[in-house]
Design a protein with these regions (language model features):
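Primary detection of the long, small/polar-rich alpha-helical "axial" segments characteristic
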Residues: 1-264
């Protein structure tokens, strides 16, 4: 009988030790599921949620890159707008009949500097090596966890359009030339504004997309956490309980061994 009790007691001690080990592992890792043996189905589900979280986070980074692209383009377009506004101011001045040829020549010299700067900005505006204002380009932004979650971004060749509108042909050296330049400048400004509005709309859309992706990431992380994360209060209580059982078992085993020694 004593042998049976001793065996049962040893089993209790070993089981308590194993449960203490499991609790320690969960407390140290913060996870309820540390291997498939803990909960095979739960591990599969939590892994699926983790994969989605990573995908949402990367998609948000992709969308933020798109926002940076849109902001870069808008900054360049803003500078072009400022140059056109100054160019229009000079053109209005040159169109005034009170100026002489020398006055208009000075205004024309500054105007040529402005058109050169507009050309330079439209030629060099780029993001990560991709031309934004001097090429017709189609870009796909991957902004979701699945293959079809893309936003298409098109960039127009603004530089070419400005050339077609006569940017390099502006001549303020005569009153008639200045008057003719006004319509060309206004059409060019309208084209710049169209592109600014498109990049502004893209910026707003991507900002909303990032917000949605971040919320989706949070929701999936919470779902994963409910399945895979350890309940610290529960694990500590379980650890204390099993520690008491183990120590009680050891005490009983020690007493049993002492009685056996006395009998002998």
């Amino acid at each position: 009988m004593n042998s049976i009790n001793s065996t049962n007691n040893s089993a209790i001690i070993n089981a308590s030790l194993e449960r203490i080990k499991t609790s320690n592992e969960r407390l140290s890792s913060g996870l309820r599921i540390n291997s498939a043996a803990d909960d095979a189905a739960g591990l599969a589900i939590s892994t699926r949620f983790s994969t989605r979280v990573d995908a949402f986070d990367q998609s948000a980074r992709n969308a933020n890159d798109g926002i940076s692209l849109a902001q870069t383009a808008d900054g360049s377009l803003s500078s072009i707008t400022e140059n056109f506004q100054r160019l229009r101011e000079l053109t209005l001045q040159a169109a005034n009949g009170t100026l002489n040829d020398s006055d208009r020549q000075a205004l024309n010299t500054e105007a040529k500097q402005l058109t050169s700067e507009i050309n330079r900005i439209s030629e060099t505006a780029s993001f990560n090596g991709k031309k934004l204002l001097s090429e017709d380009t189609e870009l796909e932004l991957q902004v979701g966890p699945d293959a079809g979650d893309v936003i298409n971004v098109g960039t127009d060749n603004l530089q070419q359009k400005l050339q077609e509108l006569g940017l390099d042909d502006l001549d303020l050296s005569s009153q008639s030339g200045a008057q003719a330049a006004l319509s060309s400048i206004d059409e060019s400004l309208a084209e710049v504004n169209v592109q600014r509005s498109e990049f502004g709309a893209l910026n707003n859309r991507l900002t909303s997309t990032v917000s949605n992706l971040q919320q989706s990431s949070i929701n999936n992380e919470q779902a994963r956490s409910r399945i895979a994360d350890a309940d610290f209060a529960k694990e500590v209580a379980e650890q204390v309980r099993n520690d008491i059982l183990m120590k009680s078992g050891i005490a009983v085993q020690t007493q049993a061994n002492q009685r056996s020694d006395l009998v002998l």
